[in-house]
UniProtKB/Swiss-Prot annotation:
PANTHER family linked to this entry: PROTEIN S-ACYLTRANSFERASE 22-RELATED (PTHR22883:SF265), ZINC FINGER DHHC DOMAIN CONTAINING PROTEIN (PTHR22883)
Entry keyword Repressor: no
Alphabetical list of InterPro entries matching this protein: Palmitoyltrfase_DHHC (IPR001594), PFA4/ZDH16/20/ERF2-like (IPR039859)
Protein's name according to its UniProt entry: Probable protein S-acyltransferase 22
Domain notes from UniProt: The DHHC domain is required for palmitoyltransferase activity.
Reactions the enzyme catalyzes: L-cysteinyl-[protein] + hexadecanoyl-CoA = S-hexadecanoyl-L-cysteinyl-[protein] + CoA
Cell division is among the record's keywords: no
Domain of life: Eukaryota
Domain (DHHC): residue spans on this chain: 163-213
Family to which the UniProt record says this protein belongs: Belongs to the DHHC palmitoyltransferase family.
Any one of the GO CC terms: cytoplasmic vesicle membrane
Membrane association type: Multi-pass membrane protein
Length: 596
């Protein structure tokens, strides 16, 4: 679990950001400010630039050093580094390491003492570094504590109760989000900034926004001063040769000076563009009252809708396309026929491509493969675009974020986790109307609190012969001395929750299904009973009932043999599933429903 951005390992973008700002600051005081003209101009330039760079450095250090984690994370075992057994194995490891060898006891004891001394020295060095870092960040901390408002923890606790994070194993607030990079829950999570190597949440969002504004002004000051110096260098070339030799040394000529100033100016201009784009993006976020995480969730939801719709645009997409002024009949569409028309990538970096037509198959197997590809496909990273954000509806974005929180398997409401398995559930298996009074291991509770049943269904292949079934039924018929015209009954697993309707004394063999049955009506093909069998069953009702009860033993033995060749398929739906699969309308299915 990462506590702050200065914790090892550093991100490469963090190293780049620190190096660029240090290089720009050094270049301004050495190559920019001394060559702006008169002394008064130099003092003005340094007087403006110095507070800006001080503010940027201080805010950067403070934003990266702050811990935006949820309050509950501070009490977690991961944050406190407490093992699961609650015991610290430090002393035990030292003891085991010291007493592991018997032959060279003295040498091992010496190495153990050295290891403990090295560990204590490292701890002292780390404590000194942390105290030095706190001393450097104390002015920024004082400024930020004065500017920050009151705590809103009581307000969050009153909103829909508390939530539980299964990864942090603590209770968190409603709008907290678990960051996979930092491996902790962040209070009012906005995004994970790779340039800071830290998460941005409620605790450091204001500092992050202030850092953005200060950095933009600093970069504008940098490249505007650089352009001014380059113009003066072209106009006063002879004077600049003398000034360069006087202030930088005789070995430094005009050409290297122009190269250094030009490179730093271009670098500052290039850094200003994405930073200004990010600034306007967060201005729109604040205006709409949403976060960066909500924006990302909404765009991914739109991508899924486009893929599921087969190229049809959602209302929000159509509205965006109408604002951009590019229609589907434009010349851009000739190069991207299967894609939704978007502005150039300079203004809108995300393109919402639909599924290509060749990937979609008419057959049911093709549809299944396309769905599996969509499920297995990892979500693409969403790029920041103020143009897209300006055309999004804030209410729809909030709804998408709320649905994402409801579907989350990591952070769930406390009430949802403590919801017991109560209630009655009808069990339907060929006409049985029994009810289960206790939950099984195949039952669960979905997000809405309703019960859900996962049934196991056995499907007979079409090429399976009916001779074993006929032999079992013929043997049972010979034992009961009934008419030989009885057709073999459909084999069924004996369930403890079935009623005796199927084994009643009546001669008619009824096969019924309740609305909750996982077998569809068009897939059920029970064996018909002849008229002779019906008459014989009516005359010998009692004897047939006794015979059917005795028949169950033979059926169970035969079923155990046949189940070894039967492919199992589980239904994870809410009670309804296409039992025939892809070949349901080609081969008559003989299904055996087994419920637990």
């Amino acid at each position: 679990m990462r506590k702050h951005g200065w914790q090892l390992p550093y991100h490469p973008l963090q190293v780049v950001a620190v190096a660029v700002f240090l290089a720009l600051g050094f270049a301004f005081y050495v190559f920019f400010a001394p060559f702006v003209g008169k002394k008064i101009h130099q003092y003005i330039a340094m007087g403006i630039y110095t507070p800006l760079i001080t503010c940027v450095v201080g805010l950067y250090i403070w934003c990266a050093a702050s811990d935006p984690a949820d309050r509950g994370v501070f009490r977690s075992k991961k944050y406190l580094k407490i093992p699961e057994n609650g015991k610290f194995p430090l002393a035990k490891d030292i003891k085991d390491g010291c007493g592991s060898a018997t032959g060279g006891a003295k040498s091992h004891d010496g190495t153990c003492v050295e290891d403990t001394e090295n560990g204590s020295n490292k701890k002292l060095e780390s404590s000194e570094r942390s105290s030095l870092l706190r001393l450097l960040c104390s002015p920024c901390a004082l400024l930020c504590s004065c500017c920050s408002g009151k705590d809103e923890s009581s307000e969050q606790m009153s909103e829909d109760g508390m939530f539980y994070c299964s990864l942090c194993e603590v209770e968190v607030f409603k709008y907290s989000k678990h960051c996979r990079v930092c491996d902790k829950c962040v209070d009012r999570f906005d995004h994970h900034c790779r340039w800071l190597n830290n998460c941005i949440g409620k605790r450091n969002y204001r500092k992050f926004f202030s850092l953005m504004v200060s950095a933009i002004f600093l970069l504008i000051m940098q490249w505007s001063t650089g352009i001014f110096v380059l113009v003066l260098c072209l106009l006063r070339r002879n004077q600049f040769n003398a000034d360069i030799a006087l202030k930088l040394g005789s070995s430094f000529s005009l050409i290297p000076f122009v190269i250094v100033v030009g490179v730093c100016t271009v670098l500052a201009m290039l850094a200003t563009l994405p930073l200004a784009q990010l600034f306007f993006f967060h201005i729109l976020l604040i205006k709409k009252g949403i976060s960066t995480y909500d924006y990302i969730v909404a765009l991914r939801e739109q991508e899924q809708e486009l893929e599921a719709g087969g190229g049809q645009q959602s209302p929000q997409m159509s509205m965006i396309s109408s604002f951009t002024g590019l229609s589907s009949a434009s010349s851009f569409n000739t190069f991207h026929r299967g894609a939704w028309c978007t502005p150039p990538r300079l203004f809108l970096e995300d393109q919402f491509d639909v599924v290509p037509p060749e990937n979609a198959s008419v057959s049911s197997y093709g549809k299944k493969s396309v769905v599996e590809e969509r499920v297995k496909k990892k979500p693409q990273p969403v790029k920041i675009s103020p143009w897209t954000l300006a055309r999004l509806n804030a209410e729809e974005v909030s709804k998408a974020a709320a649905e994402a929180r409801k579907k989350s398997k990591i952070i769930q409401p406390v009430a949802r986790r403590e919801n017991p398995f109560v209630g009655l559930e009808a069990s339907s298996s060929f006409g049985s109307s029994g009810r289960r009074m206790f939950p099984t291991k195949y039952e669960g509770v979905n997000n809405n609190g309703k019960q859900r049943r996962q049934s196991k269904r056995i499907r007979l292949p079409a090429e399976l012969p009916l001779e074993p079934l006929m032999n079992v039924q013929t043997k049972a018929a010979m034992e009961t001395s009934t008419s030989s015209g009885l057709a073999p009954l459909q084999l069924e697993a004996r369930s403890a929750f079935q009623t005796s309707r199927a084994m009643s004394g009546s001669g008619n063999v009824m096969v019924t299904s309740s609305p909750e049955s996982s077998l569809d009506s068009h897939d059920i093909h029970p064996f018909r009973v002849s008229s002779e069998a019906e008459d014989a069953a009516q005359l010998n009702g009692f004897s047939s009932a006794v015979g059917l009860m005795g028949q169950q033993r033979g059926q169970q033995q035969q079923q155990q043999l046949s189940m070894m060749m039967m492919p199992l398929s589980r239904s994870t739906s809410d009670g309804y599933d296409a039992s025939g699969g892809e070949d349901s309308d080609q081969v008559p299915s003989r299904n055996i429903h087994k419920s637990r």
